[in-house]
Amino acid sequence: MAAKSKKILLQNLNSFVLDSILAIKDGEETPQSDASLVANLRKQWESSEFQKKMAVEVFGIKGKNLTPGPKRNKSAYMFFCQDMRQNIVADNPDCKPHQIMSLLGCKWRELTTKQKSQYYKQAADDKERYLDDKELEKRRNKTPSKLSSYFLFCEDERPIVKKEFPNMSTKKVTAECGKRWNEMKINDPKKYKYYVEKAAK
């Protein structure tokens, strides 16, 4: 099997396993897996050491960029568990992990659609974040000569925008970067030239 095909297979395996690990339903069924167990399993799977070992021993791949990519987005139910788990554990100190998850499932089902909406909003924002990070990673993996001046500008400007507007959604952050890029081309030609020359290297 060619090295490129092996890497694609590894990426697909990572995607499948992470999707399976995080497959906690938002519907009426009580999730069966414990959130802390899911988090620990995911952490172990995503670790660079584990990824490198699996890449070498299973696929015979050596080199860089073997990690499974950006942190996956959470479901609405995951955000709910993250928000409520500590309180449930405090109120039920003798309960085992699977019992805590059962209680969380019951609490989730008791919520009205309006009460659940905040968690669905968090999940939607987190999905935007994941897709944005995934696109950034995809572009970073290309050769430097293929990176556009606009992308290089966004890499520098995005952290600044997020710091200035911590509650801004990923979509709006991207829009703000685009706005600043257009303003820079008009108001700061020296800076614009810097990114054009950087992209040309």
From Swiss-Prot:
Gene3D superfamilies: High mobility group box domain. GO terms for molecular function: DNA binding. It is found in: Host nucleus. Keywords: DNA-binding, Host nucleus, Repeat. Residues 70-138, 143-201 bind DNA. PROSITE patterns: HMG_BOX_2. It comes from the Viruses. GO terms for cellular component: host cell nucleus. Its main location: host cell. InterPro entries: HMG_box_dom, HMG_box_dom_sf, HMGB. SUPFAM superfamilies: HMG-box. It holds the Pfam family HMG_box. Belongs to the IIV-6 401R family. This is High mobility group protein homolog 068R. It comes from Invertebrate iridescent virus 3 (IIV-3).
